[in-house]
Curated annotation (Swiss-Prot):
Pathway: Cell wall biogenesis; poly(ribitol phosphate) teichoic acid biosynthesis. One of its GO terms (biological process) is cell wall organization. This is Ribitol-5-phosphate cytidylyltransferase. Belongs to the IspD/TarI cytidylyltransferase family. TarI subfamily. It comes from Streptococcus pneumoniae serotype 19F (strain G54). SUPFAM superfamilies: Nucleotide-diphospho-sugar transferases. GO terms for molecular function: 2-C-methyl-D-erythritol 4-phosphate cytidylyltransferase activity; D-ribitol-5-phosphate cytidylyltransferase activity.
Amino acid sequence: MIYAGILAGGTGTRMGISNLPKQFLELGDRPILIHTIEKFVLEPSIEKIVVGVHGDWVSHAEDLVDKYLPLYKERIIITKGGADRNTSIKKIIEAIDAYRPLTPEDIVVTHDSVRPFITLRMIQDNIQLAQNHDAVDTVVEAVDTIVESTNGQFITDIPNRAHLYQGQTPQTFRCKDFMDLYGSLSDEEKEILTDACKIFVIKGKDVALAKGEYSNLKITTVTDLKIAKSMIEKD
């Protein structure tokens, strides 16, 4: 089975324009989270869309699904997320297992709730690549020169941009593989390895690159929200 896991566990309101976490802010005529879920609803191979939300916001998320996506609510599960990204993925996979016991072939397409401009092509590419690889990471080529500084004051290295990519989401992998690899980490490793695909890389697994889009914006600042609103208006 193919599942989607939407990471919507953040509670930050640092934009300073609302008491709502950013995934619940309005973008056009509906919340950012709803825009994101809608993209996954369009992919018929996805059995269930599991949304990991902070415990304080579960009922709010359920109300939004009832209001904006009543025809698809049977395909959507709202569950309590974890304290960080990887524990939220773990909670999402546990919710999948509760819905239907996991098999070794079950795949989850994980995605940031605040990336509402994901395309159907990106979702399908992730699913296709995950059939033949241990994991998939969605990326775009780095367009800016990236500099490295070990002390925050002086440049210590300028890597070759031709070899660099900017990570986005989705990140896709088999549910059981993630649970096994995450479970094998020490507490210290869990603190350091906050990116799911990095766990696969560190453990020597095959992580394929899926082509992202520069429009696959992650809305984390007021400027991001302004850009996103402009993109919605143009559409």
